[in-house]
């Protein structure tokens, strides 16, 4: 009988934890009504009701789904226990900073820009933003997807699934040990700094979502921890848990020194960087650069005279060692796949949306290929999902397709050890794809012994290296 009651007992405890968390967030929302607490994103006044609503959706889906998972380590039940306990702890920290309910007056220091209390509140707002994004990613629409969550970078996805299986969260100590099997971590201060960077929600655990964000920020995978060390530990321009407003405030001291800059993980676009810098006329601009390794963006910005003085300091670290050319990945298109394209009176390399330009972009994480012009037009229409499979677009990578005659799978020059061909799965035009425009002409069919090859070119994406200026807080 005790065994039979165990799942029901877990459900009851989980339901109570949801209720406590929602009520706590609602009380915090009442404490945040002072208009002076209105900040640029992430704003607690905006995040608290959205998080409460999402929690209610998750709770409702859990009730409708019955028992859910049996409480296995790293599953949805285990994640929620960790998440709700952390949410309660962070909520109480916020409550201690805010005026009690029913009292409008508060410590003036809380509203003074740059004060200790204001900084603490801003950092907690960033953590709440991370927690909302994590819950939304692992429970879209309230339903758990952590066991099938797709990391953006393919090598990171392979690492997680091979070593962590279907789990979506691990204690830090276990994760550190697993990561050390392919990226050794120095014990002591370096390991503590790494934990601070990866553990976005400050829970003492690492979720698959947090690891996804980390590997996007410090790509590419082969030099992941080296990138992190040079960019986050040693670089004076790196700022953690900083908001848009705080970047503006910090750079105010350097408005007479154009080229001063700092960079931080974006608060609103997790997995991307936001760079603030002083322009030639002394104004402060913030931008989210194109999806490419940060080291390449900073080097290009240094060359162009934008990023010269990290946090106002005269010494700008040399990042050229992070920009070594990576081995090109090759995709082999089989004879059977080519026959299917020929049967459609098309070719593999032709973009299946416009049917005019060749494919030159790979969408991450789904891997679909199209031309950069069509992707830009698609995203300009405010769509952030793949036009073929509707998977969220988290990144993009430039590709180059060229004709290859014969059966070899590697170029003549260079070491061919990394140039093994692999099959590319078809699926470029699922049923949900947008309709193709009329085509008056198509290129002639290629000879059957001519097979297109695909090269993935790191850091060679067509848009401007520095990215467009972001008009909204990041």
Which residues does each predicted region cover?
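Short, flexible/disordered secondary-structure transition segments
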Residues: 32-39, 62-72, 94, 98, ...
């Amino acid at each position: 009988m005790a065994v039979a009651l165990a799942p029901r007992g877990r459900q009851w405890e989980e339901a109570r934890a949801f209720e406590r968390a929602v009520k706590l967030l609602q009380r915090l929302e009442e404490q945040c009504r002072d208009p002076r607490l209105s900040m640029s994103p992430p704003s607690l006044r905006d995040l608290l009701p959205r998080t409460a609503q999402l929690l209610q959706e998750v709770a409702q889906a859990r009730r409708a789904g019955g028992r859910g998972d049996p409480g296995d380590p790293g599953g949805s039940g285990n994640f929620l226990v960790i998440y709700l306990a952390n949410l309660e702890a962070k909520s109480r920290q916020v409550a201690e900073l805010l005026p009690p309910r029913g009292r409008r007056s508060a410590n003036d220091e809380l509203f003074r820009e740059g004060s200790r209390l204001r900084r603490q509140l801003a950092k907690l707002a960033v953590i709440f933003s991370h927690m909302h994004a994590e819950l939304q990613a692992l429970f879209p629409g309230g339903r758990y997807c952590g066991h099938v969550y797709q990391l953006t970078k393919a090598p990171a996805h392979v690492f997680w699934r091979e070593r962590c299986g279907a789990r979506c969260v691990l204690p830090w100590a276990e994760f550190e040990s697993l990561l050390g099997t392919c990226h050794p971590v120095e014990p002591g201060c370096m390991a503590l700094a790494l934990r601070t960077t990866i553990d976005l929600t400050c829970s003492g655990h690492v979720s698959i979502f947090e690891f996804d964000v980390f590997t996007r920020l410090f790509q590419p995978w082969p030099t992941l921890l080296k990138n992190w060390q040079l960019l986050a530990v040693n670089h004076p321009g790196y700022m953690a848990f900083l908001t848009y407003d705080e970047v503006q405030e910090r750079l105010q001291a350097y408005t007479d020194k154009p080229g001063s800059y700092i960079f931080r993980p974006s608060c609103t676009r997790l997995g991307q960087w936001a760079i603030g810098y002083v322009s030639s006329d002394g104004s402060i601009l913030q931008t989210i650069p194109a999806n490419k390794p940060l080291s390449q963006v900073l080097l290009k910005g240094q060359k162009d005279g934008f990023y010269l003085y990290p946090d106002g300091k005269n010494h700008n670290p040399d990042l050229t060692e992070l920009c070594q050319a990576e081995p090109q990945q090759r995709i082999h298109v089989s004879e059977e796949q080519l026959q299917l394209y020929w049967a459609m009176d098309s070719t593999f390399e032709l973009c299946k949306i416009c049917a005019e330009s060749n494919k030159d972009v790979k969408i991450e994480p789904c891997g679909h290929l199209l031309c950069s012009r069509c992707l830009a037009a698609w995203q300009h229409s405010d769509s952030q999902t793949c036009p073929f499979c509707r998977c969220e677009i988290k990144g993009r990578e430039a590709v180059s397709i060229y004709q290859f005659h014969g059966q070899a799978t590697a170029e003549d020059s260079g070491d061919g050890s990394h140039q093994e061909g692999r099959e590319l799965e078809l699926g470029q035009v699922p049923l949900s794809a947008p309709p193709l425009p009329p085509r008056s002409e198509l290129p002639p069919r290629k000879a059957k012994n001519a097979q297109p090859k695909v090269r993935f070119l790191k850091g060679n994406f067509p848009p401007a290296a520095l990215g467009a200026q972001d008009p909204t807080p990041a």
